[in-house]
Structures are given as C-alpha cells and as structure tokens.
Amino acid sequence: MLRKFKGISPDVDPKAHVFESADVIGMVKMKEFASVWPNCTVRGDVNRIEIGRYSNIQDNSCLHVADRYACIVGDYVTVGHCATLHACTVEDHVLIGMGSVVLDGCVVGTGSVIAAGAVVTKGTIVEPIP
C-alpha cells in the first residue's frame, strides 16, 4: 500500500509493482519494473529511498533511512527475503542474500553478492566486481 508521510507520497512508476500487503511510505521513488513483494516496509520518512529499474525487494524485507544517509538501490538488484537495508547504497546488479543486514553509510559495489545472514557493519565499502 502506498502511504503519504508528512504530505509526501511515494513516486511509483506505472510499470512498477507494490503488493497490497507491503507498505511504501513517504519519500520513495520506484523506477520501471521495480517490485516490492508481500509484507515489506519501505519507509522514506527522514530521507529518501530510490529503487532502481528491474530491482526486486522480496518478502518481509525492510528498507529505511537515516538523517545523514538515503537508501539507494540500483538497477537489477535482488534483495532476498527478510533482508534489512538501512541508510545504505546498493549499486547495480547486486544480490543481497536472505536475512542479511546492511547498515548506515555502507556502499555495496556493482556486481557484489552479500551472503545470506551476513551483517555489513556501518560504513563498510564493498568493492565492485569488475
């Protein structure tokens, strides 16, 4: 469900899809063919969230922000079930494994894979895969 926060509504491309049981709140931009699956929370309350083209946020995942950091998800990204992305940047063609947590200020480089259940601690830079 799309929800306003402080008068700001999510901006969802007509070709993107949000399941009814998901909550997409506030300053969120979803590009074409992006999808947010059941029971996810994507909450752009104090900063913005962007979900790139063809990226999918799978069941029970949470995307959130911090005052200092937005949450940016590039193109062709898969965020596995029950993952948490908090105030981080995930570049293009990345797989975020099920149940993993990526914390504030992290940058996950293009082509990287974050293992299921991993915790990527605050400020970590995961180098791109050439």
Located regions from the model:
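Structural signal for interior beta-strand "rungs" in well-ordered beta-sheet cores
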Residues: 5-7, 11-130
